[in-house]
Amino acid sequence: MAQKLWGSCLFSLFMAALAQETLNPQKSKVDCNKGVTGTVYEYGANTIDGGEFVNFQQYAGKHILFVNVASFCGLTATYPELNTLQEELKPFNVTVLGFPCNQFGKQEPGKNSEILLGLKYVRPGGGYVPNFQLFEKGDVNGDNEQKVFSFLKNSCPPTSELFGSPEHLFWDPMKVHDIRWNFEKFLVGPDGVPVMRWFHHTPVRIVQSDIMEYLNQTSTQ
């Protein structure tokens, strides 16, 4: 009888775990598609001060982490963590690029000229200055999305099956590969081809660990 009860208990635990995995609508990370046509080097963007157009070709040979950012988001604390990632992975030829966007909860309402001041004195505040390049505010989804994000999204599966509440999402039309919220991340390899994509809630320390694991794997190939 005890063996039957123990077996039944194990089966119930297994089924509960399986159900939890099945019901979980997002993944912390996904690998991008194989055989992608094109590279990020075909695109570029203006720096946040509008003083320079940067062709992403200048990052050829580097690993690039593209991040859509916002100043008044619950995830804005990610900013200092991105500074740490940039500092610790710079010796490994990794560079972070940030793209302010106001499409998720209207959480980046300021002008380009106001964003850096807001980061320094409001959120995260405390004199914070990003040690990575920020670009002009723009769309990452919808009819007016930046072309580089069209390329990144079409190169990688979405990290979640679900979108947030429609009243907090400001673009049209919505597509399955769209970015779900602020602080999604895309890693691009030194050949300009997307490698990985992370869910916005994935901790930066996990992103950094995933990148290091990828770098170790590629260095031995």
UniProtKB/Swiss-Prot annotation:
Main location class: secreted
Catalytic reactions of this protein: 2 glutathione + H2O2 = glutathione disulfide + 2 H2O
Signal peptide: 1-19
GO cellular component, one term: extracellular region
Keyword Cell inner membrane on entry: no
Alphabetical list of PROSITE patterns matching this protein: GLUTATHIONE_PEROXID_1, GLUTATHIONE_PEROXID_2, GLUTATHIONE_PEROXID_3
Top EC category: oxidoreductase
Gene3D superfamilies attached to this UniProt entry: Glutaredoxin
Gene Ontology process terms (BP): response to oxidative stress
InterPro entries assigned to the protein according to its UniProt record, in alphabetical order: Glutathione_peroxidase, GPX_AS, GPX_CS, Thioredoxin-like_sf
Alphabetical UniProt keywords: Oxidoreductase, Peroxidase, Secreted, Signal
EC number per UniProt: 1.11.1.9
Keyword Protease: no
Active site as annotated: 73
Domain of life, source organism: Eukaryota
Protein family: Belongs to the glutathione peroxidase family.
Protein name per UniProt: Glutathione peroxidase 6
Organism, scientific name: Mus musculus (Mouse)
Lineage: Eukaryota, Metazoa, Chordata, Craniata, Vertebrata
Gene designation per UniProt: Gpx6
